[in-house]
A protein has these predicted regions:
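Phosphate-coordination loops involved in phosphoryl transfer and adenosine-cofactor binding
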Residues: 36, 97-101, 173, 182
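Oxidoreductase and adenylate-handling cofactor-binding alpha/beta cores
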Residues: 73-89, 118-122, 250-264
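Phosphate/diphosphate ligand-binding glycine-rich loop within oxidoreductases
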Residues: 16-93, 195
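Rossmann-like dinucleotide-binding domain for NAD(H)/NADP(H)
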Residues: 61, 75, 173, 181-271
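Residues forming the Rossmann-fold NAD(P)(H) cofactor-binding site
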Residues: 48, 111-112, 173
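NAD(P)-binding Rossmann-fold cofactor-contacting core
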Residues: 2-3, 119-138
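Rossmann-like adenosine-cofactor binding region
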Residues: 26-31, 131-225
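Glycine-rich NAD(P)-binding loop of Rossmann-like domains
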Residues: 83-119
Length: 271
């Protein structure tokens, strides 16, 4: 990771290809890379790349989906157990076995969540508008046809939707208020998909509702009033394992070689 945008801009001046992890590939960075042909995000999310700037320059932008999916799924369950057992404070908690979990977006991470959930003896439901019922069933979950239907039925909701113009702030009061008593929202996606003000409103109204995430919200201090009902990791932690740090970078390098040699662009995310 470069310390400043200026350092990154200087570093990319003569490159033909870039792999980025947490740095931001802004328009300024992309325009500074005069020879740039392809940029790859080492991970599934790509909201730190200015896709329009890439398109304007004729640069192909790709991601590396699935490379850190197990790491994210394992962290989701680590946080779920931590919350279910009251932060290991010695007081009785509850078991996950027999509970219903709804997986919002059933891609690589979501399917790993489903796999682990079955090991805990949970009932696994999934909503994904880009998958058919048959695909969801084949991947081991019970398909739900709307988000509203799934949120109304499940004790746990695990979020895996990307942050797009359509999904930002989409996890709102109307949707979350449908969850049963004792509902737990698990966010290892992006904080931008949560309507934070409406989540705070719901938690203030419902002392049974809990929220856990691998990134702190913008206004973390507002959650102090909900002691014992929320948990955030100090930084974005889903992909922070040795394995997940190696695999996306390796996949990104392979993407670049394949694109430069053969024009391969299976995981292109810009138009």
């Amino acid at each position: 990771k470069y310390g400043t945008q200026e350092a990154l801009i200087e570093a990319v001046a003569d490159v033909d290809a870039m792999i980025i992890r947490s740095d931001k590939a802004t328009k300024e960075v992309i325009d500074a890379a005069k020879n740039l042909k392809v940029i790859v995000r080492a991970g599934a999310g790509y909201d730190n790349i200015d896709l329009q700037a890439c398109t304007d320059r004729g640069v192909v932008a790709m991601n590396t989906p699935g490379q850190n999916s197990n790491a994210v799924a394992e962290l989701a369950f680590g946080m779920m157990v931590y919350m279910a057992r009251n932060f290991y404070n010695g007081k009785s908690g509850h078991e996950l076995k027999g509970r219903k979990i709804g997986v919002h977006a059933y891609g690589n991470v979501g399917q790993n969540v489903g796999r682990i959930a079955k090991g805990f003896g949970m009932e696994v439901y999934a909503f994904d508008p880009f998958m058919t019922d048959e695909q969801i069933k084949a991947a081991g979950a019970i398909p739900m046809h709307t988000a509203e239907e799934m949120y109304s039925a499940c004790d746990y909701i695990s979020l895996h939707i990307p942050a797009t113009d359509k999904t930002k702030n989409s996890i709102n009061y109307e949707l979350l208020s449908r969850m049963p008593k004792g509902g737990v929202l698990v966010n290892t996606a992006r904080k931008e998909v949560i309507n934070e003000a409406e989540l705070v409103k719901l938690m203030a109204e419902r002392p049974d509702f809990k929220y856990i995430a691998d990134i702190a919200p913008d206004n973390a201090a507002e959650f102090a009033q909900f002691e014992g009902r929320y948990f955030f990791t100090p930084k974005k932690m889903g992909a922070q394992t040795a394995e997940a740090n190696i695999k996306p970078g390796s996949a990104g390098a392979k993407h670049i070689v394949a694109y430069l040699q053969d024009g391969w662009n299976r995981f292109q995310v810009n138009k």
